[in-house]
């Protein structure tokens, strides 16, 4: 039996779906892990843009967005849990104190309150952010089990992949952090 000190904390890591990922919801995804503890894990899929853009989402929640470069930024599918709820992964904003914000080890924050979107709409919010609808969640031990069955690769997250890399390149870019490419991955799990 492992001691609590033996636990691996995957907070601020990418989960990269292996080719043998059985769940089609996560096939080909990169998930940024916002929280990982003995109670479970919470992450956001960062490479599945939806057909909803910021302008249409802001209209739905009665916020006016007039900042031209932001209007057509896509909203992402963050995962199959709470798909009606928004999750904003962002760099910290000096002096900002959003109502429902969680600091993530490694420097990013995740905010679920509308005030961060109000700040974005007025130009006072985070400059680099990713907005998702929904999140990915795992119960106690569930993620560890999926990793042990070769469902996921893990690697320390790089914010440049989250914020600066085009969505369609994030999977390969995350694999590149491990020094591999998708052509090197096998769908077959091997055990000695």
Curated annotation (Swiss-Prot):
Pfam families: DUF179 (PF02622). It comes from the Bacteria. Gene3D superfamilies: VC0467-like (3.40.1740.10). GO terms for cellular component: cytosol. Coiled coil: none annotated. Belongs to the UPF0301 (AlgH) family. PANTHER family: UNCHARACTERIZED PROTEIN YQGE, UPF0301 PROTEIN YQGE. NCBIfam families: PRK00228.1-1, PRK00228.1-2. This is UPF0301 protein Bcep1808_0798.
